[in-house]
Amino acid sequence: QNFAGTKLKALFEACGLEHGDMDIYHRHEQSDTTSPVQFSVASAVEPGTFKPEDMPALSTPGISFFMSMPGPTNSMQAFEFMLETAQCVVRNLGGELKDERRSVMTPQTIEHCRQRIREFERKQRSPRQ
């Protein structure tokens, strides 16, 4: 079952995402689009874009949530917002939440993601050798 563009657009906007750069949706740290991006959402179908004028006719089998590090001021907070938004899509529109290897996300997978973020931030803070 595919996701309808109009339903995705309404849900993304309700979750505070803005259409922007690269024709995809982004969640910014502040309500203005000049603040750092916490995470982004793209269509799983090439080219991955969500053009506003195409949303009424859009139908996609999947969407990808992703974040870049370094990027957000608080990476863990950005991850939690991204996870909550992805879970909101599943609750409201169906589908399954999967990881970067396309395996179903479990509480253990989610905790592993958090550990990877903590490790990345620890390395960013440690003095360079």
PLM ranges: what are they?
Residues Q1, F12, S64-P70:
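Short glycine-rich or small-residue beta-strand-to-loop segments that form or flank ligand, phosphate
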Residues Q1-E53:
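Short, highly charged
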Residues L8-L11, L17, L58, L83, ...:
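Generic detector of leucine side chains in alpha-helical contexts
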Residues D23, T60-I63:
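Short glycine-/polar-rich loops that comprise or flank the Walker A/P-loop
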Residues S40-P56, Q115-P127:
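A broadly tuned preference for mixed-charge, low-complexity surface segments
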Residues E53-T60, S75:
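Internal insertion modules embedded within essential enzymes
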Residues F65-Q129:
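Well-ordered alpha/beta subsegment
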